[in-house]
Swiss-Prot record:
GO biological process entries: innate immune response; regulation of apoptotic process
PANTHER family per record: TUMOR NECROSIS FACTOR ALPHA-INDUCED PROTEIN 8-LIKE PROTEIN 2, TUMOR NECROSIS FACTOR INDUCED PROTEIN
Family the entry assigns: Belongs to the TNFAIP8 family. TNFAIP8L2 subfamily.
UniProt free text on domains: The central region was initially thought to constitute a DED (death effector) domain. However, 3D-structure data reveal a previously uncharacterized fold that is different from the predicted fold of a DED (death effector) domain. It consists of a large, hydrophobic central cavity that is poised for cofactor binding.
Annotated organism of origin: Xenopus tropicalis
Record-annotated membrane-spanning stretches: none
Entry keywords, A to Z: Immunity, Innate immunity
Source domain of life: Eukaryota
Keyword Membrane: no
Function comment: Acts as a negative regulator of innate and adaptive immunity by maintaining immune homeostasis. Negative regulator of Toll-like receptor and T-cell receptor function. Prevents hyperresponsiveness of the immune system and maintains immune homeostasis. Inhibits jun/ap1 and NF-kappa-B activation. Promotes Fas-induced apoptosis.
Name of the protein described by the UniProt record: Tumor necrosis factor alpha-induced protein 8-like protein 2
Amino acid sequence: METFSSKDLALQAQKKILSRMASKSMVNMFIDETSSEILDELYRVSKEYTKNKSESQKVIKNLIKIAVKIGVLFRHNRFSPEELVLAQDFKSKLHNGAMTAISFYEVEFTFEKDVLPDILMECKNLLLRLVEKHLTPKSHGRIQHVFNHFADPEMLCQLYDPKGSLWPHLQKICHGLNKLIDEGKL
């Protein structure tokens, strides 16, 4: 069994960002167990689709770094009232995307190839606007990388193919998304 763990990556990202305050409990403030399981499944989807372990690790590592950085900015009240409106718009759009992803999974023959990529691109643009003044161009590149990677229509078509090899991962991802929604975290 492979030793990849999104929690370990989250801890590495947190250590780099928060250097003196890095601890496993601090990572858990940003990435809970359910989110970690979803990230692990996203990694498996990416790895199976791209056949590239290092690229798949990099995209998840970038996702974790961005999530932790935004969490740090939010916890330290770095966002202006206008940016908080953008954050709420992003959260709403992300929630909409999760609900759409779940619906496509639960209701046969409803998957539409262009819908999720469009939602993900809207999320990406909102997030880039939110962090424009707070994060470096390198972090902006990470955001681009993550959203562009998971908005790949061909990957999504394979993911939503009930007879495909990625389908079991989709089941776990949607189960996790449902749990986050039920808990009010997404």
